[in-house]
């Protein structure tokens, strides 16, 4: 089963997460099918904290992918941020 979830990167005490579509049998930071965005929880200043390719998320969901609870929360948060601008 394909899952859209967070894969941790960054360094100690400075996390950075890639939002990836991966097989659920693979490890959290292991092999993935496609990177669909990123989340930087410690973004400061002009750094971008969250970017998601909604078209790719929709593609994977239409092909049966499940969103992890955290990924679903971030997608919802990003859509709320984009909607008022549009």
Curated annotation (Swiss-Prot):
UniProt superkingdom: Bacteria
InterPro entries recorded: Ribosomal_bS16, Ribosomal_bS16_dom_sf
Statement: the UniProt record of this protein carries the keyword Acyltransferase: no
GO BP terms: translation
Pfam families cross-referenced by the UniProt entry: Ribosomal_S16
Gene3D superfamilies: 3.30.1320.10
Signal sequence coordinates: none
UniProt keyword annotations, A-Z: Ribonucleoprotein, Ribosomal protein
A GO term for molecular function: structural constituent of ribosome
UniProt record similarity statement: Belongs to the bacterial ribosomal protein bS16 family.
Protein's recorded name: Small ribosomal subunit protein bS16
